Amino acid sequence: MGQVILGRVISGSGGAGIIALAAVIITDLAPLRDVASWQSYLNVVATVGRSLGGPVGGFLADTIGWRWSFFGQAPIFLFAMILCGIVLPDLKPRNTQVNDEVASSRLRRIDFLGAAFLGTGLLALLLPLRIGGQKVPWISPIVLSLFAAGILLLALFVVTEMRWATEPIFPLRLLNNREVVFSYFITICQTAAQVGMMVSVPLYFQVTKRSSSTVAGAHLMPAVIGNTVGGLLTGAWIRKTGQFKAPLVLAGVISSISYVLLILRWKGDTNWVESFYITPGGFGTGISLSAVFIALQAAIDPKDKAVAISGLFLSSPIGSILGMAAGNAMMQAIMPVDLASRLRNLGIEGNEAEKVIKQAMARVDYLDEAPQGIARVVTQAYVRGLEYSHGISLLCAILATSTALLMKNGKLN
């Protein structure tokens, strides 16, 4: 298991670098008005890849073994390397010669210490959000210690960037630009809202329809398609008009409509038409991520675009973890209380009620074993908890909309 975890760390580091680097290359090769369209194409490819990765990996694991899920990536990456070497233009000046001494000097300027403090600090802060309330209680010494360590490590990162780093991995002066801060905040909020919804939708259909994991996951496709279409349309809009604030505001409004519909209409007897209520959520997120990328580029000095883009891509996983953690925390807080109340109405209290609540919270397939009356109230409690989870997504979308309203109404030349 340790070897698998180490491999995932290496793979994730390279994958994250590739995504950010691809975005930087696009901004180098295309006019800013066209960047949104090209970035939306990149998002489409990434979405297709993420959508195919799970089913293909599962198929390989079920047929020839899970190891081939890792071996199979090697020829794909090799093909990508060859393609980049052939197709990408060489932007390095022709007469530039880099000797060993110059290369060594450049290597020494890399802010390895700042990168270490930033990476470990974020890990220490975000890890308790993943395990809190699930693996360990929120007030566990492990959770509190990780939070404290994360704060300390990020403080050391700030000191390193301000005092010691020759070329900071992330110049803190960028945060003096409110457009940069707003762009990061909108990305965090929209991603948190979308991921919170994407996590809850399969659970909803597993509980209310007793759907298999595959069928429940398939209900996410309307949101995925909406995300793709939203990104493509936004790219075309920005290319034609040069305006990016209006899509940012509209994105939050459209997403909010989706979450309101889920709260009001998903009561456990959802029909096929109502299953498309998640489409506006994906559509709004696609609009937002394309528009915010351009808003960030328009607000910064070109020499800062690489680090600014990296910060934007860092905001997305932060939002993902916050969205999952907030949704889970809301479920953990609401569902047991609601279920206990419903069980009392059935005359079930005390140790018997605690046993039912514990089993219902631990596994969805308990619904297949429980008596009909208990299964019904467990389902209702799940639905109530998910309503509050969608409320978190709605709050995030409202925050994103409010922030977008505060951004400058710029227009690209």
Predicted regions, residues:
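Helix-loop-helix hairpins in multi-pass membrane proteins, especially solute transporters
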Residues: 1-113
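Helix-loop junctions at membrane interfaces in 12-TM secondary transporters
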Residues: 1-8, 264-278, 334-338
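Interfacial helix-cap and linker-helix signal at transmembrane-aqueous boundaries
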Residues: 4, 56-64, 129, 133, ...
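Transmembrane alpha-helical cores of Major Facilitator Superfamily
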Residues: 9, 40-48, 52-53, 188, ...
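Small-residue-rich alpha-helical segments with characteristic i,i+4
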Residues: 49-58, 274-354, 388-392, 405
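Hydrophobic transmembrane-helix bundles of small-molecule transporters
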Residues: 67-185
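Transmembrane core module of solute transporters
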Residues: 141, 145-152, 156-307
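Transmembrane-helix exit segments and adjacent C-terminal regions of multi-pass membrane proteins
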Residues: 361-413
